[in-house]
C-alpha cells in the first residue's frame, strides 16, 4: 500500500485516530506546539484531518502517519501511509 504512494511536495503529519465510523475514511487529530508571541509560552494546538484509509485497517486510538495527496472527496485530501502504533 505505502509503496505506491509518494510524497512529492506534500506535508506529512503524525496524529491519533479519533473516528473510523465512515467507510475507508478516518479522522486524525494532529497536535502541534505553538509559541505564544507575548507570553513566550508553548500552547498545544489541535486540528482534525479526514484521511483515506483504503483497507479499513485503522481503529480509534491508533497513532498514524498521513500525507497530503490529491483530493479524494470534498474534505479528504490526506492519505494513510502507515500505522505507527496500534491502540491497546
Swiss-Prot record:
Keywords linked to the UniProt accession: Ribonucleoprotein, Ribosomal protein, RNA-binding, rRNA-binding
One GO MF term: structural constituent of ribosome
A cellular component term, taken from the record's GO annotations: cytosolic small ribosomal subunit
TM region(s), chain numbering: none
One GO process term, biological-process aspect: translation
CDD domains: Ribosomal_uS17
Keyword Protein transport belongs to the record: no
Pfam families: Ribosomal_S17
Matching SUPFAM superfamilies: Nucleic acid-binding proteins (SSF50249)
Keyword DNA repair annotated: no
Origin: domain of life: Bacteria
InterPro entries named among the record's database cross-references: NA-bd_OB-fold (IPR012340), Ribosomal_uS17 (IPR000266), Ribosomal_uS17_bact/chlr (IPR019984), Ribosomal_uS17_CS (IPR019979)
Subunit structure of this chain's protein: Part of the 30S ribosomal subunit.
Function: One of the primary rRNA binding proteins, it binds specifically to the 5'-end of 16S ribosomal RNA.
Stored HAMAP family: Ribosomal_uS17_B
Similarity comment text for this entry: Belongs to the universal ribosomal protein uS17 family.
Protein name from the UniProt record: Small ribosomal subunit protein uS17
Organism for this UniProt entry: Oleidesulfovibrio alaskensis (strain ATCC BAA-1058 / DSM 17464 / G20) (Desulfovibrio alaskensis)
Taxon lineage: Bacteria, Pseudomonadati, Thermodesulfobacteriota, Desulfovibrionia, Desulfovibrionales
Underlying gene: rpsQ
Amino acid at each position: 500500500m505505502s509503496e505506491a504512494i509518494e510524497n512529492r511536495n506534500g506535508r506529512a503529519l503524525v496524529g491519533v485516530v479519533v473516528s473510523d465510523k465512515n467507510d475507508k475514511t478516518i479522522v486524525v487529530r494532529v497536535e502541534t506546539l505553538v509559541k505564544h508571541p507575548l507570553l513566550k509560552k508553548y500552547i498545544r494546538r489541535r486540528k482534525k484531518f479526514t484521511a483515506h484509509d483504503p483497507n479499513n485497517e485503522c481503529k480509534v486510538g491508533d497513532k498514524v502517519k498521513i500525507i497530503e495527496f490529491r483530493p479524494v472527496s470534498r474534505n479528504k485530501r490526506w492519505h494513510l501511509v502507515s500505522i505507527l502504533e496500534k491502540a491497546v
